[in-house]
Amino acid sequence: MAAISRLPEQGTLEQDQSKKINKEAEALINSSSYWDTDDLAAPHSIKDGKEASKWLEGYDEEARKVLQQVAVAAWNYFTAASPITKQHLTEAEDVARVFLKASAKQAQQFEASALEDPIEQKELNVISKEGLNALDAKTLARYNSLLGNINKIYTAVDVCESKEQKVCIQKYSDLISTIQINTDGPHALSIWKSWRSAVGQNLTEIYEKLVDVTNKAAKLNGHEDAGEMWRSAFDMIDAGKKEKMYDVAKATEAAYAKILPFYTQLHAYFRRQIAATYKSDESLVRDGPIPAHLLRSSTGDDWSAAYEETKPFDQMDKLPEEITDNLHKQTMKSRSMFVKVFRYMRYLGFEQLPDSFWKNSVFSRIWSKDMICNPATAYDMINGTDFRVKICAQIGQSDFVEAHKLFAQLYYKFLSSEQPFVLRDAPNPTISGAVAKAFGILATNVNYLKSQRLISPDAKLDQASLINELYHEALSSVVKMPFSLIADKWRYAVFEGKIGAANWSDEWWGLREKYQGVGAPKNTPEAQYDAVVAAEISQQHAPASRHIVEYVAQFQVLKALCAHSKTSLSEGCIPKKETIMRLIEVMKKGGTISWLDALEQITGTRELDAGPLVEYFGPLINWLSSTNEQDAVFLGWDGEGEKFKPEDIPRPRSENVADRPSIPSDDQIAYPGGNCAHGQECLLDTTCNGTICVCNAGLFTLQIGDTYNCVPDDPANAGFRDGSGLVIAITPNNQTKNGNSTDGDAASNEDSTTEPPKTSDSTRPALFSLLLLFAFVLSSVLMF
């Protein structure tokens, strides 16, 4: 990579940290009265509504200037990562923090109830929250340092796979890939113990300090503890008044109870299937919890690595390959694939996008730059006309589905752009995320795919393929629900001081066994560190409930969009235009309504309801129930520890590779760091280690974010060093929309049709919303 050798001439972050290079951002500091914190009035002492309204008007203009610098710097960094673009982003974020802290102090002077407009009241309340910025500079720096140290442990600590290993060079990322392909029980246990032994004690000490600092920030914001502060985004607690309009902890517990019968069937089937893989592991019994080290993931919140040897049916689904083939036959490129999806969105009733969308978006990887490809993300550049997406798309079903999700995210930003600046985008990121995921399911509907000539007119999704697809989804996502519930229950108890560090392990494993049916490996002292080594606990210092809310809500949104469809919910639908128009009206309101209002206006209920989720997985649930009954499988994990009998254990499976094409499609190739677990061919000087593409011997791995490159020289010598801080990926919200999309013109005449626009064979991200920016900068709730 030629750019490596030139980087030293440009300087490194270590050399330039004291020298400010983002002049545009620096010039904004103290450029108006909104940065001033001297001689402020007492909180809520200004009761003149007109004065408060005028202040909000000026704030709107100043905030745009500041956050536009963040948006531009973020775009430049994620599309062309380098020490220079990273420093530009860091400095823009630092300037934004100064502004947000100062403006929050100013906003606190005003009495919100003096404003006649309820939207202005909400606007003022959002701005006045300090969150973590309520900490003094020294304590805030300590908080950031603690997070940085946690990240260093995850990236820098060397771990042995076994006690016999003399030279330990494996990192956390190496262990993850090894765990996913490991089918040897003792070896899996050795890796499981080694990681916890290597980092557990250090992480425990750091996490205790992190809890203390986060609780201090919560109290400064009027909350009892950090758990209450985290929940406030969903509970909508007004600190001080203590009026709880919703109990998200109770709601997520109810959602778990609703899916528990399904989860129990899934757990029982999976436990029996992996017994064929781990026959010699006596810790796996037919009626008890599954030992955590046998789940093929670092924390046991994703079981999909065992999909191939446990899937219900051996046959392969041919539709993804057919979709990919037909996209190629239509001479599709990444950009034209997005044009195809955009025409569908236009058919459904969504508006034209500005010309800038097609001019400025990045649809495929730019190989001359070090792009950070993941996550694929929708951006609002804050200038009123510029909305973009960034994705390293490949032609195939996966990114065809991703395109639908990105458009849904982008339209939430675009359509709400006429709302006050801090109330643009969804009222809570879980709502926009749920809508986006629902559109991802719509993209797989057979009738829609036929209309796009992506599958043959007589193609059908057979029952076996559907059940396999639902099973894979359940292993990767449904099993996360109890783990996320546990993660928050445990942390809330820690924040509240109900359990001390000496009892952390007992509480953690009690919750894991009760809710997840997962147990600690026997006679392993290292298990005491299991909670703090979980990335969702220490690395992702934010409430896990947001995952449950978003995941459950996506099926509620899907059911609302498919209310008039005759197909099963599992198959998606082509929504009616009047249904989409109701969704569009909700999107236009942005954050001026609460997340519960948005949920109600989209789905018809203000409750988080897992019923549609259960309906969606209905075919799989019925199959699991029948199969488990036929095989006399024990349901639950509260048995006496009965061992599997030989006749209880199914035959081992092997992957069916008979029908792989000799020339791989885009879905069957992978790049450095990419997934090759299903036979993808590794490109660009890499070899498959069984799970991911790793650099060939003699090459160095350069990792920037989630993007990997294989280079001949040590990247550390070229200015790429492991930093101690977190890069905040910020995507601000929308503004006024102007201009028409030239690429979408062909879709504008399709609105009167009764089917999605047909095409001939010749037709060619948790980044954060603006509220997340305020959240991240202002509080841990911000971390939503």
At which residue positions do the language-model features occur?
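C-terminal, non-catalytic "cap/extension" segments appended to globular domains
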Residues: 22-24, 34-52, 84-86, 235-240, ...
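Post-HExxH zinc-binding segment in Zn-dependent metallohydrolases
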Residues: 248-259, 426-462
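Active-site recognition of the HExxH zinc-binding catalytic motif
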Residues: 398-414, 433-437
